[in-house]
């Protein structure tokens, strides 16, 4: 892989991991179009490892929030009042919201990996329509401080749906938050915070299992470093841009993006450019790793 291609993959990972449009779908299709097969262990390792860059972007961008939530939860435990403050409660609600995706990932990982490109196209369209419904029907009034245990669990279930390629981890969780009445920005902010435990755990597991595939592959190793750095830097900027966008604008642009991407993938399948089935298992969805 050339360094230009590696940088483009890193940029694509950053854009589609945080925007509610599915990084899995875009990385898979872009890779297929450039002739990179997931049968190639080096490419699979590359796709998996560059997602560490976007995980790092979340950690850096929300470092103050994460430190505050962890400290509050620790103080609450030490004082025998784990839910004594709003910040401590939010920290534990994030842990609670992580449970559904962790269980689903463990139980369904290999079945999910057998799904093909028609599923990606269908997920892009279906979740795009759900996002449209959330945009039009939700109240958009609640703040992050209003998150309760039930909200965290329901949004956690939405996060588990991101295991389906094409659904998007950020897409399912932001949509879930909006359907529960949260503002667009609050839904996105909670979505990003909720991603931290699962992406760290899944990322560590995937890194451990895929890094050996790059041993002795100097060119691929350099390309992977470039892609990871680009995804980290661009990911930080995308988070900042998305939160600013959602403060004053709607998600309609992402609805259109999802519908157009789903239609384009379907057309590529029908024309024979893309295979219909999963000839090789897709990379795990970015958030879990997951499908964002």
UniProtKB/Swiss-Prot annotation:
Q: Name one GO cellular component term.
A: plasma membrane
Catalyses which reaction? Answer: di-trans,octa-cis-undecaprenyl diphosphate + H2O = di-trans,octa-cis-undecaprenyl phosphate + phosphate + H(+)
Membrane-crossing residue ranges in chain numbering = 1-21, 46-66, 90-110, 114-134, 192-212, 225-245, 253-273
Q: What keywords tag this UniProt record? A: Antibiotic resistance, Cell inner membrane, Cell membrane, Cell shape, Cell wall biogenesis/degradation, Hydrolase, Membrane, Peptidoglycan synthesis, Transmembrane, Transmembrane helix
| GO BP annotation list | cell wall organization; peptidoglycan biosynthetic process; regulation of cell shape; response to antibiotic
- Localization per record: Cell inner membrane
Topology class, membrane: Multi-pass membrane protein
Coiled-coil zones: none
Fetch the InterPro entries from UniProt: UppP (IPR003824)
Under which EC number(s) is this enzyme classified? 3.6.1.27
Q: Which GO terms describe its molecular function?
A: undecaprenyl-diphosphatase activity
What job does this protein perform?
A: Catalyzes the dephosphorylation of undecaprenyl diphosphate (UPP). Confers resistance to bacitracin.
Family under the similarity heading? Belongs to the UppP family.
- Misc. remarks from the entry: Bacitracin is thought to be involved in the inhibition of peptidoglycan synthesis by sequestering undecaprenyl diphosphate, thereby reducing the pool of lipid carrier available.
The name this protein carries in UniProt is: Undecaprenyl-diphosphatase
Q: Which gene holds the coding sequence for this protein?
A: uppP
